[in-house]
Each structure stands twice: as C-alpha cells, then as structure tokens.
C-alpha cells in the first residue's frame, strides 16, 4: 500500500504536461487506452447510426409555444422545473422556444411533454 501512496504523491507533484506524457507512455507500454468506456461504446455504434439514435437515453424537452392557456402552461412549468419562481417560469414560457428540461430519461421527458400538452403548450422532445 505504501507504493500506491508514493505514486499518488508523485503524481500530485507533476505538471499536467508531465502527467499527459506519463499517460501516453503507460498506454504504449501496456497496450491499453485511457479513453472512457462511453467513448468505446460510441465508436462501436458509429457503424450503425440508426441504431445509435434508437439507443438515446437522454432527452431534452423543448417548449415550442404556450398556446392560448399561458397561465396553465406557466403553472405546469413551475411544477416540472424544481426551484423555478413565478417570474422565471413566466419568462421561460414567453421566451419560447426554450428547453424546459435537458438530459432527462425518456420516461421523465414523456411525462413532462404530456403535462405541458395537456395544459395547452406545444412541446417537442429531442
């Protein structure tokens, strides 16, 4: 365990350029890569872009317009977006098209879209 602590201390004293050089040499010596596993998965999916689109797991909910029932839409926006005050929600609705939620799960995006559409808003999920 002392060796690991010594290595950490040494790495802590190195500059970013020295660390970058170390990583390159480490990758060459042990024939590995320091790339994140997500990047590896994305590289495999690049061969079939249609499949990559189907496997999307993060969605943005975009408010395209408030429609006729702006007050109802503002109430729903405040309900969906936590910590949003009345003025912020009003500005968000009046400034449409704007993202309401970003990088959320499909279930959450669909639920938010349904609530907003029920209130009279025009919404898209991307």
UniProtKB/Swiss-Prot annotation:
InterPro entries: Ribosomal_bL12, Ribosomal_bL12_C, Ribosomal_bL12_C/ClpS-like, Ribosomal_bL12_oligo, Ribosomal_bL12_oligo_N_sf. One of its GO terms (cellular component) is cytosolic large ribosomal subunit. One of its GO terms (molecular function) is mRNA binding. The keyword Transport does not apply. It comes from the Bacteria. GO terms for biological process: translation. Keywords: Ribonucleoprotein, Ribosomal protein. Homodimer. Part of the ribosomal stalk of the 50S ribosomal subunit. Forms a multimeric L10(L12)X complex, where L10 forms an elongated spine to which 2 to 4 L12 dimers bind in a sequential fashion. Binds GTP-bound translation factors. Forms part of the ribosomal stalk which helps the ribosome interact with GTP-bound translation factors. Is thus essential for accurate translation. This is Large ribosomal subunit protein bL12.
